[in-house]
Amino acid sequence: KNKISKNWVNKQRRDTYVRQSKVDGYRARSAYKLKEIDEKFKIFKGGMSVVDIGAAPGSWSQYVAKVVKSGKIISIDLKEMENIENTLQIQGDFTLVDTQDRIKEYLKKKPDVVMSDMAVNTTGIKNIDSIQTGELCKEAMVFSKDVISEKGFFISKIFMGSTFNEIVALGKKIFKEVKV
């Protein structure tokens, strides 16, 4: 193994959230970022309908499934995922109209939350990664505008980079309120 991968493994072993995710049964540490957002803004409630775009490996969907319990969760990703109780999983490319139509087909009502943790496979060139991931975020926002309930929430991860302000500005055009 090269030095970079050894450093990554060592960092993972020391990471508190990585260790805690194993204890709590989450597939990734990102569940705690969503939990932090939820605790701050009080988003998720029992019975909600949620769409999770870019869901693999599934930690955001796992967190939401625990909170919304009897709600409906649709998880979408290019990658195959292990099943998560109380979720409908769609394996497909979210950027394709066919996949977006399949999501809309499964929705019986407008979702309360659309969340996106989509990111491109990183190149290691931060500006390029930021731009490409920003494009995915914008696509998820535009989709959300058409499907989300009137009092619904859109949650997304975006990289700080050259397109950050542009993405926030688009969010302000689409949604009543934007919090970063």
Question: At which residue positions do the language-model features occur?
Answer:
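Class I SAM-dependent methyltransferase Rossmann-like catalytic core
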Residues: K1-G46
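Glycine-rich helix-loop-beta junction characteristic of Rossmann-like nucleotide cofactor-binding loops
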Residues: E39-K45, L107-K108, D146-V147
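Conserved class I S-adenosyl-L-methionine
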Residues: G46-A56
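Glycine-centered, small-residue-biased loops immediately flanking beta-strands
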Residues: M48, G71, G152
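C-terminal substrate-binding/active-site "lid" region of AdoMet-derived donor-dependent transferases
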Residues: V51, I84-T87, V114, I125-V180
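Conserved SAM-binding loop of SAM-dependent methyltransferases across substrates and taxa
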Residues: P57-K69
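Conserved SAM-binding motif I beta-strand of class I
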Residues: K72-D77
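S-adenosyl-L-methionine
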Residues: L78-T123
